[in-house]
Amino acid sequence: MTVEDLTFDVEQHIDMKATPEKAFAAVLHRLGKGNTRPDGQSLELELEPKPGGRWYRDRGNGIGHLWGFVQAIKAPNLLELCGPMFMSYPAINHVEVKIEPVSGGCRLALRHRAIGMIDPEHRKNVGTGWNHMLSNVKKDCEQR
């Protein structure tokens, strides 16, 4: 097994016609109650937007899955999350979302790094999931 087998590092960004404040609110929504799979099905996520706040999936009837914790939050420019996320095996993840003003709006940059016994399917599809989330943030900001 190599280091590459045990890690991944995904970076994506998207520009949008929105203030950083509006984009940050949309990020919180899309990482929480507004998070969906690409087929539109809700992931039933909750995000407590405060240092140490939980990020978890609540399926009801006491069924759930801890995705992580808020490591840092500096609205409207930075959100960092860390934890197992969707990986039910030995792994740790760090997700960093940065928002900065640019001409005509703002840029949202996302970086997801992981280390552990990474499932090849997760490695293959994680970028698609983040692209879906970023597209929804942009749509939320530009349609309102």
Can you annotate each of these PLM segments?
Residues 1-42:
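Hydrophobic ligand-binding cavity/cleft-lining segments
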Residues 7, 14-15, 25, 48-49, ...:
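Charge-dense, helix-prone N-terminal extensions
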Residues 12-14, 67-72, 93-101:
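Hydrophobic/aromatic beta-strand elements that line small-molecule binding cavities or substrate pockets
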Residues 23-27, 55, 70, 81, ...:
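Hydrophobic pocket/interface hotspot
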Residues 42-84:
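Glycine-rich portal/gate segments that line the openings of hydrophobic small-molecule binding cavities
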Residues 44, 139-144:
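Short, highly charged C-terminal tails/helix-capping segments
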Residues 85-132:
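Beta-strand/loop substructures that line and gate deep hydrophobic ligand-binding cavities in soluble
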